[in-house]
């Protein structure tokens, strides 16, 4: 399976996270030197009025609110340029499933380490994900973390 095959697969409609994992698992060079990356993105749907999952949300790429579909992604890298493989994702749809982006962060990270047996030594993420609950989970899973600098005076999300 080539990198292009993964890209083509992701472009297909109705791909599940489990199907994605089955496709990319043989491509991973998983080791204790690997890292996981958690990031979210917004698929711009500003001209779509009939799609159920479209909602207003912040887009870093746009620097403001846009109508779109939010996706939280978990990516694996072995540090070699070009070796970035999505291994899990979640659609951010709090009205449908009641889950926050932080819930998805914890679910995907736990699944990667406990079920998929990923050997990566650490996880990289934006400071938005640096909640107390998330950091405790990262430590419990035996991972190190790297995050963007926390802003002084800005309250980080703390979930119970």
Task: List each language-model region with its residue ranges.
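Generic structural signal of hydrophobic/aromatic residues within well-ordered alpha-helices
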Residues: 6, 20-24, 28, 105, ...
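Hydrophobic/aromatic beta-strand patches that form the interior of the parallel beta-sheet core
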Residues: 36, 85-87, 146
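Electropositive, glycine- and tryptophan-enriched low-complexity nucleic-acid-binding patches
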Residues: 2-8, 13, 59-119
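Active-site-proximal, Lys/Arg-enriched surface segment
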Residues: 9-81
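Short, conserved acidic/polar surface loops in the N-terminal third of protein domains
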Residues: 46-51, 85-88, 135-136, 158
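An internal, acidic/charged active-site-proximal segment
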Residues: 91-160
